[in-house]
């Protein structure tokens, strides 16, 4: 999947800032074992004033950790970044490919997941596809 250079995008907001204004959010931190991508992908139900997206962390997710946000769109694209350039240039194409692979499920979770039961959230998480080794 071709990726344009990630320049001139705003800094990614810390996760703590995005969670502070939310009433109810379902979320999960997905490690490499679940995604096939080194680092952690944070997925959530609708939050903030932005459109559907995931956050990528180069390591464990954390409220003040650098990250990049990738839209759940066709095609996915980086819309905010606070990671070092070399990290985002390596990982953004992988995260974009993973988002494309799971787009329908991620959009359904973003739009409807806040009302799901624990069993429904578990089925969603278990149904996400892992990116094949490249």
Regions found by a protein language model. Give the residues of each.
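Short, charged/polar N-terminal "headpieces" of proteins
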Residues: 2-56
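Serine/threonine-rich low-complexity intrinsically disordered regions
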Residues: 10, 20, 31, 60, ...
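Low-complexity, charged, repeat-rich alpha-helical/coil interaction segments
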Residues: 14-31, 42, 77-79, 88-93, ...
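Generic detector of ordered, mature protein regions
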Residues: 29-31, 54, 65-69, 81-85, ...
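A short, structured beta-strand/loop element
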Residues: 39-93
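Short, compact, well-ordered microdomains
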Residues: 87-133
């Amino acid at each position: 999947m071709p990726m344009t250079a990630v320049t001139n995008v705003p800094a990614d907001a810390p996760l703590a800032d995005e969670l502070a204004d939310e009433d109810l959010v379902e979320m999960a931190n997905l490690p490499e074992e679940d995604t096939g991508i080194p680092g952690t992908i944070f997925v959530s139900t609708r939050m903030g004033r932005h459109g559907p997206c995931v956050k990528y962390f180069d390591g464990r997710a954390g409220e003040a950790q650098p990250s990049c946000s990738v839209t759940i769109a066709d095609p996915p694209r980086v819309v905010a970044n606070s990671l070092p350039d070399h990290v985002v240039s390596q990982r953004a194409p992988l995260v974009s490919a993973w988002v494309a692979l799971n787009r329908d499920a991620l959009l359904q979770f973003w739009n409807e997941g806040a009302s799901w039961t624990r069993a429904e959230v578990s089925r969603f998480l278990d149904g996400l596809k892992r990116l094949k080794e490249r």
